[in-house]
């Protein structure tokens, strides 16, 4: 392959000259203790920084006042590079929520304390039932009400427990490592369903 406008002899004479210019710079950086990939590493670190100071993140109460009769069908959780996520699945749309840090999470209707592992506790109230309001038939059947999801190995989550469902309100207790930034939002789908999403950051 021939490069237009560039002669072979130009390349042969220019390459050593460039090498002589670069070598002192590399040596100087090494003596200064700067790794060769420092700039690349810094750039990569900036790109992967977890932005928990932007809008919607924080440790104060998050709420949405609307309510729905669309029932809850599942609770699940997953891990992200910057946060742990809990998802409440609903068979329909329109759910509201109140999520806040509290000294103790109490069950719906009875007010009994829910024991939770972790240095801080999130009281999650989803404004939707876990049953069909017309028939009373349960729509969510966890195998263990004290361990709705196995969160072993999670960075922030320590325990997810049921607080029951009463008069269209459902409580879930989330034990976390410490009082860390969180955000809550609604996602539509799949299909005609929707999801209440709670993210809790790994760090401030």
Label for each model-derived stretch:
Residues 44-204:
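Short linear recognition/processing motifs and adjacent strand/loop elements at protein termini
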